[in-house]
Amino acid sequence: MFRGATLVNLDSKGRLAVPTRYREMLNGESQGQMVCTIDLHQPCLLLYPLPEWEIIEQKLSRLSSMNPAERRVQRLLLGHASECQMDSAGRLLIANTLRQHADLKKEVMLVGQFNKFELWDEQTWYQQVRDDIDAEQSTQEPLSDRLQDLSL
């Protein structure tokens, strides 16, 4: 399970160093093989260990290519999916097209989200956190049953 937000740097080749606390887990779970794709709703990237991505691919394969909305989701997620292999120094090369999509510069936030990571431009991440907190404080919407059951 991945959790927490960590500031990492992209080098001049577009590689990021995976924090050491995740490297052993990723090497054991996926031999360092990862898949990176776009997020459909946020200006960030999604980074999955290969076994987790294969579950997503199975779900995508069950969508109908005859349904326009389902086909769009397939096209966006699969069409942007890029395999990344963690090297011996624990670095992942993020494809240039993906870096451009999320406007990733030198400072990148690696955000653990259970079975995957999100990759955010640092400033965009902090703005998103502020926006999320503001939305939670000002929302008039009733909580879903699942959120009502969540006790922190």
From Swiss-Prot:
Residues 5-52, 81-124 form the SpoVT-AbrB domain. InterPro entries: MraZ, MraZ_C, MraZ_dom, MraZ_N, MraZ_sf, SpoVT-AbrB_dom, SpoVT-AbrB_sf. It is found in: Cytoplasm, Nucleoid. Pfam families: MraZ. One of its GO terms (cellular component) is nucleoid. The keyword Protease does not apply. The keyword RNA-binding does not apply. One of its GO terms (biological process) is negative regulation of DNA-templated transcription initiation. Keywords: Cytoplasm, DNA-binding, Repeat, Repressor, Transcription, Transcription regulation. One of its GO terms (molecular function) is DNA-binding transcription factor activity. Belongs to the MraZ family. PANTHER family: TRANSCRIPTIONAL REGULATOR MRAZ. Forms oligomers. Negatively regulates its own expression and that of the subsequent genes in the proximal part of the division and cell wall (dcw) gene cluster. Acts by binding directly to DNA. May also regulate the expression of genes outside the dcw cluster. This is Transcriptional regulator MraZ. The gene is mraZ.
